[in-house]
Amino acid sequence: MEYGLISKFYMDHWRWKIREKHKVENNLLSTYKYILNFHYHMVHPYIRSTKGGPNRVMNSVCVEHSPCEHGNLFCECIYCWEHDGQCRGRKLDLGASTGIERRLANDNQQPGLSDLYCTETIHLATAIPERRTIDRENYVKDFAGQTVGDLYPQLQGSTGASEPIDFAFPTVGSGSWEILVRESHKHFEPNYTEEAYQSHIRSVRRRLFPEETMDNNGSQASTTEMLRDAVQRCGFEGPPNSPSENNRDGIDGTCISTVDIQSNCIVNAHCPKQGTSNQTNKRKKSTDTTESSGSKKNKSSNYQQNLQEQGSTSISDTIDIVDGELDGSTGSNRETAYYTFVLHKNNVKEDWRYIATTRAKQAPSFITFDHGDHIHILFSSSNTGGNSTRVRTRITKFLSATSAGSAEATITFSKVKFLRNYILYCIRYGIETVNIYGNKIQQQLTEAMDTFKILFENRDPNDVILEAGCKLYHEEKKDNKQKRCGQRKQQNLTDIILEKIKEKKITTAQQWENQIEPEFKIQLMKEFGLNVDSYVTRIVRIERTRIQQLIKAKTLTEIMLEILNDEYIKHFTPGEDNSKTAKCIEWIEYLFKENNINIIHFLAWNEIIKTKRYKKINGMVLEGITNAGKSLILDNLLAMVKPEEIPRERDNSGFHLDQVPGAGSILFEEPMITPVNVGTWKLLLEGKTIKTDVKNKDKEPIERTPTWITTATPITNNIDMNETSQILQRIKLYILKKSIQHRDDKYTINAQIQNKLISRPPTLIEPIHMAIVFIKNFTKIYNLIAEEDKAHTVNEKAIQINNEVKEEAESWQTALQWTMTENNEEQNENETQALEDQVLELAKEQATT
């Protein structure tokens, strides 16, 4: 078939199809295909004659942009690429008829209308009808009984049949039929090249079968199906999926395949030899169970194969364990999208390749376009963008980006809606190399490389601007870009600060100043100015409040389990000496025993206070002499509870409780209860709602907040007996009578003091030690709480522990008891062996003497 005029055989074929359309067609699938083909070729004819020469007058491609400089509607040169596919205002009617002479009709008579785009002449009637549109009345008359449902009822009656396209056939010879035939040129568009012809076919296909495509402002998934339909995939040499010696492709810092650009040609890709590494692939075992037999066979092959061969083979629908992306058939492209960001090379460590060899994790999958002093990074992730931030962070860590580089990546991060436009943008500003990295090549990245190969080989060398400065890549129009930049700028700054706050676990503005690198803060000031500090202060406050609200809703058991899950593996290593940790736990139990305090009773009441379990009891007091271990116990027990600390010096201030509103818990150090403030203290320790003064604000209410107090003297020293009894009813009091020994000094420590001293702990006491003690006695603690419930009024609003937490605590309890027993047996064996060795040495000394 010619690309210009429709041949006689072609039209005879479809006339026969029309005559046969009323016959019985038993095969449902063939019937449906026939309807699609008829609609595709007859209702929407889209092949227009190319005669007339290059000087023909052509209207604009769309209502907003000027026509192509080459007279081509779908030009793909450097100058015209940004208009193709971006405008929804395209015109289907490209102008009036040109009046070009056509060949005669089949009956060799001069046609009545010479500008009809078909080989059959529709002779003019005695009077040319004035109406050129089909109104409702004519539609009912001319299309009666001609719909798909009327002609092919089996399409709707068959089980599982898909819904046919909604169109109807006009009655042959009717007025509507004549109008459609005479105005069929409205559906024609000029085509001058093979690529333009294929592009137009795809546009008609998209109108017939709408897909998730891209628009100017939408956030739908990008796809390369249009290019893949037009030309075959162009492969290049190199095995992007072939395994290295230790099955850790891409982890050693070398790219899987590289495309070097030299002059105006493209050199075949090469795969650098993978270096060996002593690190084992921790994720290998987990991914083996999810891989299909096809992917295993593909990975185990040792021969070299190019991407074209790989594209012809089936790719298993598996999940990339590292990035959580679907790596499978073409249908998965609708669920993924492309993302990009920029990294300058001075924001990446020079030895990043060596650093990559020390990592045991799999390398992320991405493509880099080298622009000299900076690189553009392209990767695929979920279309919703929920996983894109995590993948971007993994890529920056793999490239060993500095703090300034991480900020730059976050600032320049954006979604790629038009893959072809993005690659043309990279080509326009010059490319030195194109690299693919990753332990596993995703299908989306393979399609991106195929698209790059096609566009690079068909580029115009005069359009490449090698010395031009690379501009930021934006796909919006200028007006949309200006509207977006203000909001996006604030959003980027907020995301950068919030990500850093979560990474460093910052809760105050001063921690931001102390822990954040100066280079990172300077980079933010370059991009956003001096208002960064106000953003930091506000975001830190919001994040601190969020954390407090989460902790406030948890039981002490849940918090202890979180500590174990995060810290246990650091302190108990299988096969190593864990005696120091075991000795610390024994020392904590020894501390409570020396002070005549039941440790189970103490831990149970801490859980009661934290969960607000009983009415009118909202405080716990630790009273004892200096250096008795009061702060040591509470600091480690409440480390993750994060109580608001209030020192004694604020008692004389009218705003000494302004920190309490919104706090999850409170820790008072050496407070002074006087006849003046005893009423406030009773309400606070009872759990009633009170109001307090806040500077430059109205009074703020204080809801029931768990309260802990440490004091060296009784807190009721300054009030009378009646008030004392009321205070003691609202608290749980524990008295520490012995002090912890600081040093051995025979001049300062006498016999009387020596009897009141407790030996120093074997090493630094940490929250993990208190968590082990708590969970190890979990069952006993909750049994005691059940007994205490009988003697107290239970608060109906108390925080309850759920069954999942109980099951996890019980499993941890069993594991800890077994571990501690094993460590004790090992320790006893070591001590016995040491004693035996000592006896043998003494015996040898006596024998020699």
From Swiss-Prot:
A divalent metal cation binds at residues 370, 374, 376. Transmembrane segments: none annotated. ATP binds at residues 624-631. Residues 270-319 are annotated as: Disordered. Residues 594-749 form the SF3 helicase domain. The keyword Coiled coil does not apply. The active site is at 422 (for nuclease activity). GO terms for cellular component: host cell nucleus. Its EC number is 3.1.21.-, 3.6.4.12. The keyword Transcription applies. Residues 192-466 form the PV NS1-Nuc domain. It comes from the Viruses. It catalyses: ATP + H2O = ADP + phosphate + H(+). Its main location: host cell. InterPro entries: Helicase_SF3_DNA-vir, P-loop_NTPase, Parvovirus_NS1_helicase, PV_NS1-NUC. It is found in: Host nucleus. Belongs to the parvoviruses initiator protein NS1 family. In the N-terminus, the endonuclease region is involved in binding to the origin of replication. In the middle, there are the ATPase and helicase activities. The C-terminus probably contains a transactivation domain. Homooligomer. This is Initiator protein NS1. It comes from Aedes densonucleosis virus (strain GKV 002 002). The lineage of its organism: Viruses, Monodnaviria, Shotokuvirae, Cossaviricota, Quintoviricetes. The gene is NS1.
